[in-house]
UniProtKB/Swiss-Prot annotation:
Belongs to the bacterial histone-like protein family. Pfam families: Bac_DNA_binding. It comes from Chromobacterium violaceum (strain ATCC 12472 / DSM 30191 / JCM 1249 / CCUG 213 / NBRC 12614 / NCIMB 9131 / NCTC 9757 / MK). This protein is one of the two subunits of integration host factor, a specific DNA-binding protein that functions in genetic recombination as well as in transcriptional and translational control. This is Integration host factor subunit beta. GO terms for molecular function: DNA binding; structural constituent of chromatin. GO terms for cellular component: chromosome; cytosol. Heterodimer of an alpha and a beta chain. CDD domains: IHF_B.
Length: 104
């Protein structure tokens, strides 16, 4: 699912419940949530959405890598990378859904 598909699906759900809210409102809501999450991670904060999962930062220490084309050694600096860990409810829901699909 892409961001555009998420916005479209949210817009459809909002339209079912309240005709006052349109696609632009759903787009603003999704963009606001994603911006808030990105800003929190950029500040080093952890994000936890109960039943869904958590977003955190993993530290990657500096290392010596190789250029795959030339084989030359390359110094790779330290960095922090975003990491998502699925919550128990999400893992169980995905597993159950996929098991049902394979058995059908």
């Amino acid at each position: 699912m892409t961001k555009s598909e998420l916005i479209a699906r949210l817009s459809e759900r909002l339209a079912e419940r309240n005709s006052q809210l349109v696609y632009k409102d759903a787009e603003l809501a999704v963009k606001t949530i994603l911006d808030a999450m990105a800003n929190n991670l950029a500040q080093g904060s952890r994000i936890e959405i109960r039943g869904f999962g958590s977003f955190d930062l993993n530290y990657r220490p500096p290392r010596v890598g190789r250029n795959p084309k030339s084989g030359a050694s390359v110094s790779v600096p330290e960095k922090y990378v975003p990491h998502f860990k699925a919550g128990k409810e999400l893992r169980e829901r995905v597993d159950l859904s996929l098991l049902e699909q394979t058995q059908a």
